[in-house]
């Protein structure tokens, strides 16, 4: 997993319910915790673009519901700034279900994916149809 050059604001708190935009069968997932989050004692973990999270499937197919999985944030509404000065924000918050190595479980990703995610997780970049 490669580092991100941009300073991404962590805008998605633990407990947030977010759309899942791949074809695994999950529609809505809830963030339980964030992998490799180092924060202050008693502070709720929060995630931004390119962070891997432990999620619970809230809505989806009966086989997928109530499962604990890993997912990566591919879009967030909160604006962030790239090193070239460009400000980027998306219309919604979205996640993609992955395995431990960051390889997506689905074969299709709906909507755009941030370039920072494609740099950190190359397999998500190849699966995505649009990279912004």
Swiss-Prot record:
GO CC annotations on file: cytosolic large ribosomal subunit
Gene Ontology BP terms: translation
A molecular function (GO) term: structural constituent of ribosome
Keywords: Ribonucleoprotein, Ribosomal protein, RNA-binding, rRNA-binding
InterPro entries, A to Z: Ribosomal_uL14, Ribosomal_uL14_arc, Ribosomal_uL14_CS, Ribosomal_uL14_sf
Keyword rRNA-binding included in the entry's annotation: yes
Alphabetized SMART domains for the sequence: Ribosomal_L14
Superkingdom in the source lineage: Archaea
Entry-linked PROSITE patterns: RIBOSOMAL_L14 (PS00049)
Family matches, as Gene3D superfamilies: Ribosomal protein L14
Key word Chloroplast present: no
Pfam families, per the entry: Ribosomal_L14
Family under the similarity heading: Belongs to the universal ribosomal protein uL14 family.
Entry function: Binds to 23S rRNA. Forms part of two intersubunit bridges in the 70S ribosome.
Quaternary structure (record): Part of the 50S ribosomal subunit. Forms a cluster with proteins L3 and L24e, part of which may contact the 16S rRNA in 2 intersubunit bridges.
Stated name of the protein: Large ribosomal subunit protein uL14
Taxonomic lineage of the native organism: Archaea, Methanobacteriati, Methanobacteriota, Stenosarchaea group, Methanomicrobia
């Amino acid at each position: 997993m490669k580092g991100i050059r941009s300073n991404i604001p962590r805008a998605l708190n633990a407990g947030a319910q977010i759309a899942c935009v791949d074809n695994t069968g999950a529609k809505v997932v809830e963030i339980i915790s964030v992998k490799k989050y180092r924060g202050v004692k008693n502070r709720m973990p929060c995630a931004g673009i390119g962070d891997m999270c432990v999620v619970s499937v809230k809505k989806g197919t009966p086989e997928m519901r109530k499962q604990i999985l890993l997912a990566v944030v591919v879009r967030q509404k909160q604006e962030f700034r790239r090193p070239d000065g460009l400000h980027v924000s998306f219309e919604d918050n979205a996640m993609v279900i992955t395995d431990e190595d960051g390889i997506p479980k689905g074969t299709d990703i709906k909507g755009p994916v941030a370039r920072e995610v494609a740099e950190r997780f190359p397999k998500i970049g190849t699966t995505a149809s649009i990279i912004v």
